[in-house]
Amino acid sequence: MLNRIHVIGSGRVGSAVAARLRERGVAVDGDDPELVLLCVPDSAIAEVAASVSPGPWVAHVSGATPLGALKPHARRFSVHPLQTFTRARGPEQLDGAWAAVTAETEAARDAGRSLAETLGLRPFDLADSARTLYHAGAVFASNYVVTLQRAASLLFESAGAPPEALEPLMRRTIENGFELTGPIARGDWDTVAAHRSAIQEHRAELDHLYETLAGATLALAT
């Protein structure tokens, strides 16, 4: 376990990480750190890493940024918490989430997995070359869900239905293990066609999105 970690960055991730480390008895404000952990925007990682004195481990928490951004440090790794963070909540946001650990040596891998476990995360190994594809998958699962919720809300608003009624439905879909239901799963193409007609009449800007998602759902259902 790393006992002295200097956390750089106090955004949503950095504040949660620092709070959890303090909970676990890790010194985050002292001198002579064993690890310098960069919790800064992706665009700032390379510049901040270059300013860190050599010696300790240097790591970042980005999902998309390769380890090369941590040059010139050879003792390096990354731990990406696969979670979405908000300032309204604290370190409990880390509990039980998975974490992608990317490392180039066994020692770095051990350090990364140790950090993840200290934070309350469930580590798995991820190749540096796979980071972009991995991050795209995470964006689908997190950011694009927000986009879909907004699209569904617009249709509810046009129908005179309360958008907040969608939230229990979305939660139950997750709780049910993403089991596919609905008209495409049933092969009810008349209903799908009726959806398209209604969307084209009231929210035409969402028709292409519906068509694309319907095609992807059909592939999933067959």
Functional labels for PLM-detected ranges:
Residues 91-175:
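Internal alpha-helical scaffold of NAD(P)-dependent oxidoreductase catalytic cores
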Residues 15, 19, 32-91:
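Rossmann-like NAD(P)(H) cofactor-binding subdomain of soluble oxidoreductases
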Residues 25-26, 74, 121, 161:
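Short phosphate-binding/catalytic loops that engage adenosine nucleotides
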Residues 163-222:
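NAD(P)-dependent Rossmann-like dehydrogenase/reductase catalytic/cofactor-binding core
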Residues 2-4, 55, 96:
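Phosphate-coordination loops involved in phosphoryl transfer and adenosine-cofactor binding
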Residues 1-32:
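NAD(P)+-binding Rossmann beta1-loop-alpha1 motif at the extreme N-terminus of oxidoreductases
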Residues 5-7, 38, 101:
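Hydrophobic Val/Ile/Leu positions in short beta-strands of Rossmann-like dinucleotide-binding domains
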